[in-house]
Amino acid sequence: MTPSPFRRIDQQLFAQVAAEARQHPRLRLNHNFHREQDAVQRFLNVLQPGTYVRPHRHRRNGSGTGFECFLVLQGAIGLLLFNGEGEIQQQLHLSAKGPTHGIEIAEDQFHTLVALEADSVIFELKQGPYQPAQDKDFLNGFPNEGTSEAARQEAQ
């Protein structure tokens, strides 16, 4: 059977991935449209309130030309931008209802996401290929995901 030349990004997909994210220990789940070796990563990231995304930045090729783009398709997300010392430089409210639906940030920008509504769905776009060992550079001073310290951090 030949694979379909298109993939729907619809409410049924949102509901399916959101249900899985609610059951996942991290309270979030990616649904990839790309293969790891693709030049462009394209995926849904579904976040539930209470998930902890350790502040990080991406340094894919060291050229400084990289980016990460977020577009909220359902729900609302808080995006926090940090400097290298871990101080919050900017807080943004991204929502499917607007007025700000998305943002593009440059590589080397430390950031984290906070789910402000249940079943929040964002479409993410960034350069590939995906290299798990090099994908994220975590900001010092913040706990690892899955620890009791992370749970306390998220509660704040």
Where are these regions (language model features)?
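Conserved short histidine dyad/triad with adjacent acidic residue
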Residues: 26-27, 45-64
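Glycine- and acidic-residue-biased ligand/ion/polar-headgroup-sensing regions
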Residues: 48, 66-84
